[in-house]
Amino acid sequence: MGKFSDLDMYLFGQGTHYDIYQKLGAHLEEQEGVKGVYFAVWAPHAESVSVIGSFNGWREDADVMTRLEPMGIYEVFIPGAREKDLYKFYIETPDGRRLYKADPFAACCELRPGTASVVADIDGYRWSDSRWMERRKKTENIQEQPMAIYEVHPGSWKRHPGREDDGFYSYRELAVSLTEYVKEMGYTHVELMGICEYPFDGSWGYQVTGYYAPTSRYGTPEDFMYFVDYLHRHNIGIILDWVPAHFPKDAHGLADFDGEALYEYADSRKGEHPDWGTKIFDYGKNEVKNFLIGSALLWVEHYHIDGLRVDAVASMLYLDYGKKDGEWVANQYGENKNLEAIEFFRHLNTLIRGRNPGVSMIAEESTAWPMVTGDAKDGGLSFSFKWNMGWMHDFLEYMKLDPYFRKDNHHKMTFAMSYNGSENYILVLSHDEVVHLKCSMLNKMPGLGRDKFDNLKVAYSFMMGHPGKKLLFMGQDIAQLREWSEERELDWFLLEQEEHRWVQETMKELLKIYNKYPCMYQDDNNFNGFEWINANDTEKSIYSFIRKSRTGRRNLLFVCNFTPVERKDYRVGVPLKRQYKLIFNSDDARFGGTGKERPLVYKAEKREWDGREYSIGYELPAYGVAVFAY
């Protein structure tokens, strides 16, 4: 039988068995002419392990596994077991406890509230996204590519009304409907929450029990492959939320897997998250690192995923994250840095990006930790991108203000450019900002009625012009009124009202410009691609800046007015004696403006302004945005 060889054990013990999912778990195979399933599990502290399942009446003595030393791997081949069979591992501990555990390497899981693993063949799907994958492989610098991400919770994007199964769209239904919407709007990527299997809907997928299995809420592993394949065929990239920071204590899960701390740190001061009530992975244990890295590789290489957004990175980097004095243990140098987690990130990111050019590793990191996107050999963590939480906080604080008080907080919208070159940033307005009484994006805006919509449109316009890749959570591009809830679909009926359509049309046009002009994404992380025209018009709360192209042509000039005051002849200094073509005017009727006719071309006049020899004059509406190409 011996599928798990000495070399397999050596590599697993070193933390470098990158195809580990092909060895551990459940695998359909034929031995000596007999078809069945080979099972293998890592449980070094166990006294004995059996496989129980639908094929043996869940009898604990029917299929006892053989222990392989020195790693404590248990294996067995069960004739007659087949695809779609349910199973668990029955573990007896030296002190007599009996544990019933799901398979950590399961390719498929029983639909909640069931907690069994499911035998699945994930090798039979015939992919048809070779053009996308070939192009991905040839992408030399993902930082120079457009990235406008639509963040989606699959279970609450749209639902079928009146069905008993929660009305979830299947992976195959989502593929079609989501692609249609994303293509119409102009997003380049979809970021999916809650794909790795998880038991509790209310965790949104951030308390994972199945690191190798797409959730069964929306279909089978093959259905999920179809979803990825379909989006790729329509030139849409896919990013998954991935959670190596912690895992839940559910009895069937990874916690105390073989009767002792196996996947988590044994010392509760390192192995527990007091705030979240979860366990922390032991990043110093090679087999645990291998488990996590193997999961990441599975999604990227087997499921063709284009990027992983790594959740809660700060909680991994700091030993004292969310903990009081006495609740944490310092490292060998007496510091609060988790040296093992740092090494894990460098290994993970260098490996994934080295084996898979064109794949993005994205950090949700909320502190000022240096060089998150710096190269590992220079002391960085080697992520491709980092969420810019600092920009997001300043931006939202500014937007919530009554326009009268914005002049005293003008710096909040310019500060991010002072550190923009320090990392490769993504500007994010994620699901976290529209839950827990934080209000929807629309209801964060000051004023009443029309004012809220006008504020939101100028906010999105500024965000799209600002350097950095972009992420917007679903529902915010239609000015969702309510906070998001995983228990219901988005309020699509709002699009029956013109104010909501105006916001959607504004976003659609901004995304069109974003994708059309390389100056909007090629030099996001350096000053070659950006220049302030006037960052200091505090009294009027107006910002003007340029997105510069590498060719000197097809540059864009942005002018954004954050007050309800119309500026009849607002003058803007310009860098060159050229004609400036108006390509976006927020006062256009389809965006909810007055529809007033304006010149489409503005010739630079030799009139010094903003420290420049030439300038143009423009009638800037209340909460108005103008974008000029030159």
Please place each PLM-identified region on the residue numbering.
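Glycine-rich, histidine-containing beta strand-loop boundary motifs that form or position
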Residues: 53, 78, 91, 194, ...
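Short, flexible loop/turn elements at secondary-structure junctions
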Residues: 43-45, 69, 80, 153-158, ...
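Conserved alpha/beta catalytic core and glycan-binding cleft of carbohydrate-active enzymes
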Residues: 304-306, 324-486, 515-572, 576-587, ...
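A short acidic, glycine-rich active-site loop
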Residues: 213-217, 332-339, 448-450, 494-501
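Short catalytic/ligand-binding loop motif for oxyanion handling, primarily in non-cytosolic enzymes
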Residues: 97-99, 158-160, 198-201, 246-250, ...
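Substrate-binding/active-site clefts of carbohydrate-active enzymes
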Residues: 110, 132-144, 153-337, 618
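Carbohydrate-interacting/catalytic domains
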Residues: 1-146, 171-182, 186, 450-453, ...
